[in-house]
Structures are given as C-alpha cells and as structure tokens.
Amino acid sequence: HLNAGFPSSEEGLAAWDRWVRTIAEHYKGVVIDWCIWNEPNGKTSGNTIEQATDFAVRTAEILRGIIPDARIAAFALTEADPKWIEPFVKELEKRGKAYLFNTIAYHHYKHNPDTGYEEVEESRRIVARHTPNIRLMQGEGGTQSEWCRNGALSNVFWTELTQAKYDLRRSLGDLGHGDDTEVFHLCDLEYRAVKRHYGLLRYGLLKTAGQADGFRVLKVKTAYYAIQNAVSVFNDALECLSPERTGSTLQGVENCVVYDWKDRETDTPVVVFWDASAMPSNDNITRQATVSVAGNPIQNPVWVDLLTGNVYKIEESHIERSEGRTVYTVPVYDSPAFITSQDILTLDQSWFVREGKNMKRYH
C-alpha cells in the first residue's frame, strides 16, 4: 500500500474489516507484531490525518479484539513528522483510544544515518505528552549493497561494506535514542508491477536472484554478519541508559557519537561509539581517540569491532585513571565499536585462533 489511499466506501470498509478479522484469526498465536498501513502520509496518497486516525482506530479495535496481547504499530510513516504525529496522538487522547497502540512506526532514510534525529526527538516529546503509553519505533531503515536505479537512497555507489556500516549505525543510533528499530530487509526484493521501484533492489542482508532464477539465495552479505554481531550483544541483556544517566565522552575525533549501555546483571558498562561525520566510507581507516568512562576501570577490558566481530584486549598501557574516571585509548572509525569487559561476552573463536595462529594486536 505504498502511498495508497484508504478504502472509504461502505462496501470497501466492510471488505477491509473482513480481511483484517480473517488474517488476525488465522495468525493468532503465531504473529504478535502488527503494523497498520505503509506510508499513509506519502505525498501522492491523498490521505488526511482525520481519515488515517479513523482507519487506524477501526483496524486496531479488530486486531485487539482477536489478539489481546498484540503489539500494534499505528502506521509506518515516511518519516517521524511532528505535523502528522501531533494531531494523531491528540485525537487518540481525546477519544480515549491510545490503549489500542503500542508504537507509532516511522521510516528513516538519510544518506548519513546519524542525521535527522531532531524531528524524531520532537515527535517523541509530543507522544510522551499526549499518549505516554505509546513509543516511537523506527520501522524501515537500511540501504542497498550496490548501485541501484530505484528505491530509497538509490543512485549511490553503495557496497557491501558501506551497507554493513550503514545498517549498524542506523540500528544502534535508533536504539541509542530510545526507539526500537528494524533493518530493511532480510533479502533482496524484486518489484515488477511498481514503476517507481521496478527491478531488483539490494537492501537485503541476503543477496538473492530474481524471479527468473527462482529467487535463489546467492550469498550472505557482510551486513548479515554485522547485524548478527550487534544483536548478539545489544539485546534485552543490556539496558540503554538515558542521556541524563550517561557520562562517557570521546576525544580526538570530531563528530563522533557515544551511547552508554550497561549489562543488567552485573552493571558492567558497555560504551559504543563511532565517527558519525559523514555517510559510511568504503574503507576502514581508523584513528586513535580516547574514551572517558565514569567509575573504576573495567575488569578485563576489550575493544570490540561490530563490523567483523573481532575482540581485542585493551592493554594496560592504553588505560589511564583520572578523577573518578577511566580513559581508554582505542581506535575509532565510521563503523560502531564498543568497550566492555570480556567477562560478559561469550566468544566464538575463529578458525584462525583455533589453529593457533598469532594475531597482531591493534595499534
């Protein structure tokens, strides 16, 4: 339903209600996450906020009636647009219908994935003021692994490396700002009936063939392993700290971002950071920087590169203590890495290590 209008006739709405009821009953006990309508605020949709509110409420009432514990997202907006979100949540507040929804989903396509959070923050404040039970969720973000002529962020010479960096930065940036996040897409897509998106689009974590070749999986992309590395650490075992509870800083590289997490069981710090100054580059040039973390030194500290999954010991010569803080000298580049204790990580040694090869420490 990309940029499509809602059914509006009595007959059309009745058919929609039957379809929602049927699909909810079919997937009850299997599917818990539901999102109502893709990009209803698209420029060519012709939808008004009033229509969208009515439509979302009637759909959510059917879903909630059949699947009481469903997690329902109101829309998947083209962006976190405060001009769309504010009247929607005000109307939910007025009608007493906020309980129907868990989240409002938005899409976030920026060439530099670390830009554009201003409107997200503004929208979050609006939602918290009027419907505090609802959260924002980044519901579609990512980029392609090669040059493609169509789709969001198209006509750019992306590579598997820049895609992997982008997906990591998008995901950890969203989580760091307090929003749940999704990666678009598991596998490559082929559009044949949509003029604007015609052909193969390479957003997938898996590279697939087109319809003519049976949609075969051709390879596992770099981004697949990068996201696998990220979710193996940044999951419910960790807590992302709000800005007022964080204190880590980074010096030596301009325009870096730093997000503080902690292990829920041990309170061990997990500090993730990267160079956010530009869109991802097609090289891995690192620069040394210092990361200052509040409190005593981390036991058995390591620097972890999420792009590769490699874990490196931080030598004592790279650690300083000063006025209740610990400063670590580590590499920084335009892909996320983090500092934590090796004690909270479960390591899967590569064949290189298992075979007894010597690996050089980073410099």
Descriptions of predicted regions:
Residues 2-129, 147-169, 195-201, 286, ...:
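Active-site cleft segment of glycoside hydrolase catalytic domains centered on the general acid/base Glu
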Residues 32-36, 71-74, 102-106, 135-140, ...:
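Structural recognition of the beta-strand scaffold that forms the well-ordered cores
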Residues 39, 80, 109, 141, ...:
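Flexible loop residues that form catalytic
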Residues 146-253:
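Aromatic/acidic polysaccharide-binding cleft in carbohydrate-active enzymes
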Residues 247-297, 338-340:
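Carbohydrate-binding surface patches
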Residues 291-311:
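Solvent-exposed beta-hairpin/edge-strand motifs
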Residues 313-362:
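C-terminal beta-strand-rich structural cap/linker in extracellular carbohydrate-active enzymes
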